[in-house]
Amino acid sequence: IADLRARSVTVAISPDSGIPEQVIERLEETPVALVRENDHAAIYDLGDGVMLFEFRTKQNTITGGLLDLGFEALKLLETPDWKALILSNDSERFSIGANLADAMAGGPEGIEAATRKLQDFGMAMRAAPKPVIAAPFNMTLGGGLEITMSAHAIVAHSELYTGLVEVGVGIIPAGGGCKEMLRRLVNPVARRGADPH
């Protein structure tokens, strides 16, 4: 983790065999301390100055409460006690995206507020002074992918099904997905100094 530099994006794929059994055993033996939690997520101390931000909603959907605790984790990351933040969970899937019912409950204003909050969280992750690492697996859809793409580094499991699937229900990936996809397409060209148009 010390070698990771903020503001650079690295994608690593785990081996097809999944996580080695000795690593799982070591993780299960490692004591973790709960730092903060709410009904939507939790922050754990993994030791060595590393925090884990775990989603806890049904299907790990992105909710306002989840993002509130995510902002708290990013604030903690600014203190000297913490060196890195990992986003993952011990669930069947990483995240199926935004909780649309939660967002639509507030009408057009609620949808706009939920979208803005997700955008702000993604930008706060990108601006974090220390590494933010996403470890997606299985289903990582919509808002879950938007959060993943905002991380400084991505360590993806070999079994990863991902996409900006909002289009299927008539929604533009407005939580940062369009911007992050474009950034990935244009950025390599911009680094060479060429005009992408």
Sequence positions of predicted segments:
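A structural preference for short, pocket-lining loop segments at secondary-structure junctions
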Residues: 48-54, 67-109, 119-137, 157-161
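A broadly conserved detector of short glycine/acidic/proline-rich loop/turn motifs that flank catalytic sites
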Residues: 57, 91, 185
